[in-house]
Amino acid sequence: DALRHLRYEGYNSYPDHFREKQKDRVEAFRNLVKAVREEIGRESFMMGCWGIMPELIGLIDGCRIGTDGYSFAGLSQYNSFNNVVWLNDPDHIELSPEEAYRSTMATSLTGSLFLLTDKPEVYRTNIVDPAKRAAPVLFTQPGQIYDVDPSRSQNLHLVDTEVTGSGPRLFDASRTPTVHLFLLEINRPFENWVLLGCTGGEDKNIPFDELGLDPSKEYYVFEFWSKILMGSYSGEFAPGKIDPLFNCQLFCIRERLDHPQIIATNRHITCGGYELDDVRWEDHILSGKSRVIKNDPYILYVSEPPGYKFKDARCTGAKVKKIEKTGMMQKIVLHADNNG
């Protein structure tokens, strides 16, 4: 850790020193990091730490975008940079009851750097489950070329003057979020759907057109952490109160079809976006392919609309352990003895 700090922190500071020697501070900083890059090679991950470092664009793979401590705010203040300029690092995730669900969720939905730094014994407890469901992080890119909260990036012109070595600086990501919704579109060959993460804010209705969805269509809304199908809605839906057990909400929103369909799965917060390889409806049979994990119960949540009656569930490579109807969906639990 000390070696990392020696290499990547502080060398962009003290402009008076470089001015007295009539040296270009940015050039000196880049030359130093270039030497490190040449030594470790392109295959090694290099992160700038901490604070926004536009001087190192093209050299570093990731950047801690703010000060010490996980920053929800930074994910919206520099969303346009993520996986375009570099990989955003909101800082390490703490698997505490207060932060485990919402921090892992926000990091994964935004496609940011996912770093756990808890004591090993924590990973033997149930609090590790949200991290398991949020990993791996899918590669995502921002859907817009602007920052949702531009309050910090609008100060990037100060980068040449705010280099004292202390911080946070006016352009570094802050710790105070102004937005609480994170939207991720999942586009697969067999289906498209959206995920909406909520970390706080007001409990008010969310219009579908503000999520880029057709307000004239009907959508199933499934809350991932509680595994509750909230219902089928047109125009908008009410998210309800955040459960203090999770401190966040994650909604999977799928267009309602006129036949049984996958509502969600439990393996990953994308509700099938990671492990589902194919889903189809033919001859009144819902079929598909999925990659499962050994000894980890895999749950399919399938709609059962009016006019249809569930008959049976069969699969190869896993055993059907339980089938249970809950409201207007079937919960199918599978168990696999091997990965695949």
Model-flagged regions — what are they?
Residues 11-28:
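The substrate-binding groove and active-site-proximal loops of carbohydrate-active enzymes
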Residues 1-14:
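Active-site groove signature of glycoside hydrolases
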Residues 43-44, 219, 308, 318:
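A structural micro-motif
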Residues 108-173, 218-275:
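Catalytic cores of secreted or luminal carbohydrate-active enzymes
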Residues 32, 93, 100, 179-180, ...:
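Short alpha-helical segments and helix-capping/turn motifs at coil-helix boundaries
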